[in-house]
């Protein structure tokens, strides 16, 4: 028998290890290169391959478990395979990536106290803007990923293939859209394509309003929303790197780790709050868990499921549009880098 305490300990250790790996990995792009256009390529590659990895893991896990005996030992073996593969990829990253950003003025700089570092971080207005964008990107996946299964089961009365088909369709369109964004970033800029993408995502969700009980309209909405959100997914990590340079320019303090860590915390908190709000709203509407043996839901719960799926993505698109409306860092970046180059040549951050 496995105790609840043992399971909790395992989860804590796993999450600590994940955080210890993910934060340095996330900030690595700002330490590898300072050219914004090159960071754009890294961001596109990272965000384009990430959903593919999720699809591979999701589609291959159960077949592998069945192939290896379909018992507890089979699950352990399959998880071990994924762990070894992940370790191999991390080692590849470790040996092949090089931190080429070396700033002599930074080596001479004394370590600053934590309050000073936090004050500089909180005074960086673009940190808040990009953290909000990173958070809503994460929340958008939480909303659709949480509500869509309920929608397919209770509104479309299908808990077999519809959710998988919609999820796969939206994910594949998102991946293709992310890679298509690479030349668009170079021509139009990160902010501009993400800003237009927000309107496309908004339009796709409004399209769904025309007939929220039609599977065809659901497919069109998923495809349009994925096209609209692809630009933000493509550029968000490159934007975080730009924020690092802006922070150094504004405060004479370079904060790669703190900026990426702060953004990461925002996404985790945002996704957690979104899940809690969704759960709370469903409970308040009278939703009854299927584990209780009840397959029918009260009308209020069905209306809540429809409302959450209708208005959640609308809110996400609105936040993206409003945030990017005042985002001017793309225009400022060349002048910022020129001034930083001159300051660093004189031994200043």
Question: What are the residue ranges of the model-derived segments?
Answer:
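Single conserved hydrophobic/aromatic residue that forms the stacking wall/gate
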Residues: 1-13
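Intracellular loop-helix junctions on the cytosolic face of multi-pass helical membrane proteins
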Residues: 9, 21, 25-149, 153-154, ...
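Helix-loop junctions at membrane interfaces in 12-TM secondary transporters
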Residues: 9-10, 209-222
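Glycine-rich segments within core transmembrane alpha-helices of 12-TM secondary carriers
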Residues: 43-62, 262-282
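Residue-level signature of mid-helix packing/kink "hotspots" within the transmembrane helices
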Residues: 55, 171-179, 272
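Transmembrane alpha-helical segments of major facilitator superfamily
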Residues: 82, 165-174
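Helix-to-loop junctions at the C-terminal end of transmembrane segments
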Residues: 176-190
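Structural signature of the two symmetry-related core transmembrane helices
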Residues: 192-207
């Amino acid at each position: 028998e496995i105790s609840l305490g043992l399971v909790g300990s395992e989860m804590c250790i796993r999450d600590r290890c994940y955080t210890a790996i993910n934060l340095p990995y996330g900030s690595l792009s700002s330490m590898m290169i300072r050219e914004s256009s090159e960071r754009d390529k890294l961001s596109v590659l990272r965000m384009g391959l990430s959903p593919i990895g999720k699809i591979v893991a999701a589609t291959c896990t159960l077949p592998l478990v069945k192939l290896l005996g379909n018992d507890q030992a089979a699950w352990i073996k399959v998880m071990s395979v994924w762990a070894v593969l992940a370790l191999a990829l991390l080692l590849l990253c470790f040996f092949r990536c090089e931190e080429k950003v070396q700033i002599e003025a930074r080596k001479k700089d004394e370590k600053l106290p934590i309050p000073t570092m936090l004050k500089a971080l909180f005074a960086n207005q673009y940190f808040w803007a990009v953290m909000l964008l990173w958070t809503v990107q994460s929340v958008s996946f939480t909303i659709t990923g949480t509500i869509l299964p309920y929608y397919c089961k209770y509104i479309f009365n299908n808990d077999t293939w519809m959710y998988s088909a919609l999820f796969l369709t939206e994910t594949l369109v998102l991946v293709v859209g992310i890679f298509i964004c690479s030349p668009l970033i170079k021509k139009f800029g990160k902010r501009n394509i993400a800003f237009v993408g927000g309107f496309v995502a908004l339009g796709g969700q409004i399209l769904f309003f025309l007939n929220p009980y039609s599977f065809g309209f659901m497919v069109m909405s998923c495809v349009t929303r994925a096209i609209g959100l692809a630009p933000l997914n493509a550029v968000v990590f490159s934007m975080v790197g730009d924020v690092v340079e802006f922070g150094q320019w504004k405060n004479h303090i370079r904060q790669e780790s703190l900026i990426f860590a702060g953004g990461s915390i925002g996404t985790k908190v945002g996704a957690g709050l979104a899940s809690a709000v969704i759960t709370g709203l469903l409970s308040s509407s009278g939703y009854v868990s299927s584990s209780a043996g009840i397959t029918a839901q009260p009308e209020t719960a069905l209306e809540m499921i429809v409302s959450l799926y209708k208005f959640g993505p609308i809110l996400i698109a609105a936040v993206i549009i409003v945030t990017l409306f005042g985002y001017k860092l793309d225009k400022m970046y060349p002048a910022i880098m020129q001034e930083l180059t001159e300051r660093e040549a004189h031994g200043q951050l």
